[in-house]
């Protein structure tokens, strides 16, 4: 695993990442942004398969505190995805010498991609968001409450510790933040009208954390709309539940950007 150093608020962080080279000249780099409990390793072989399917350079990194990346000194706050999209992601892209990427974000990573796209619309080529969140639904909170019960009653802590140096904190920061009263008002829809790049939004019809309204609102509120892919027999992780369909959709989307 590779590491790169970034600086945020006068503090240095070592960030782990993987980097698969391009095999087709002229294709934009793809940067993967993981879910709220994810990291580089939890993408499994999806980055490598995506590189093979698209011919693009594909990078994936673990945000601070996830995987083997250095943790933040403070607990996660309600605006943590804003911080990742506006501050950390730009620093990572600069450190890895990535320009005009296609962001590919899953769940929290999809929300971070939208925040970046709305904050810096001239700095990316396009975005693919899979099961993103733009606002909080009761379905989301129910799923997160169920996750807490599983955490407390199964061997999930041991399993998550295989992927994260600080697994207990990863879970607590995510779960506590989403279930806190202030987070009920979390909303990033105001970023959508500023997004001008091409968008592909993917969601499973059986998503256990959200309704399809989450991607419908992207098409409604962005100036140029978005391509929507709603997958049957698919939950909150499209790249796992419907891998072939997701790889094909992203490949076609990227090829059309040329």
Locations of the language-model features?
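A short loop-to-beta-strand scaffold at the N-terminal edge of the catalytic core in hydrolase folds
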Residues: 10-21
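Catalytic active-site module of serine/aspartate enzymes centered on a nucleophile-bearing elbow/loop
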Residues: 232-258
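Active-site loop/oxyanion-hole signature of alpha/beta-hydrolase fold enzymes
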Residues: 60-101
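Conserved HGGG/HGGXW glycine-rich cap/lid loop of the alpha/beta-hydrolase fold
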Residues: 19-71
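Catalytic histidine neighborhood in serine/cysteine hydrolases
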Residues: 220-236
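Acidic catalytic loop of the alpha/beta-hydrolase fold
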Residues: 206-210
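Conserved hydrolase catalytic core segment
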Residues: 99-137
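Short beta-strand/loop motif that positions the catalytic acidic residue
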Residues: 195, 201-203
């Amino acid at each position: 695993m590779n590491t790169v150093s970034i600086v945020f608020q006068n503090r240095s962080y070592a960030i782990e990442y993987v980097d698969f080279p391009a095999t087709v000249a002229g294709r934009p780099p793809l940067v993967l942004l993981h879910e709220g409990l994810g990291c580089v390793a939890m993408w499994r072989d999806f980055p490598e398969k995506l590189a093979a399917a698209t011919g693009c350079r594909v990078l994936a990194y673990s945000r601070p505190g996830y995987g083997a990346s250095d943790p933040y000194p403070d607990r996660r706050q309600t605006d943590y995805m804003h911080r990742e999209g506006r501050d950390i992601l730009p620093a990572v892209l600069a450190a890895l010498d990535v320009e005009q990427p296609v962001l590919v974000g899953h769940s929290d990573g999809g929300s971070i991609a939208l925040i970046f796209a709305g904050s810096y619309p001239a700095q990316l080529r396009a975005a693919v968001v899979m099961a993103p969140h733009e606002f909080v639904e009761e379905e989301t909170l129910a799923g997160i409450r169920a996750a807490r019960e599983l955490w407390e009653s199964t061997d999930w802590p041991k399993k998550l510790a295989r992927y994260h140096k600080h697994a207990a904190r990863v879970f607590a920061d995510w779960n506590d933040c989403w279930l806190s009263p202030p987070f009920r008002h979390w909303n990033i829809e105001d970023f959508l009208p500023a997004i001008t790049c091409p968008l592909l939004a993917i969601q499973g019809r059986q998503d256990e954390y959200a309704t399809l309204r989450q991607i419908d609102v992207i098409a409604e509120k962005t100036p140029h709309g978005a391509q929507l892919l709603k997958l049957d027999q698919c939950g909150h992780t499209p790249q796992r539940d419907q891998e072939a369909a997701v790889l094909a959709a992203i490949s076609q989307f990227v090829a059309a950007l040329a």
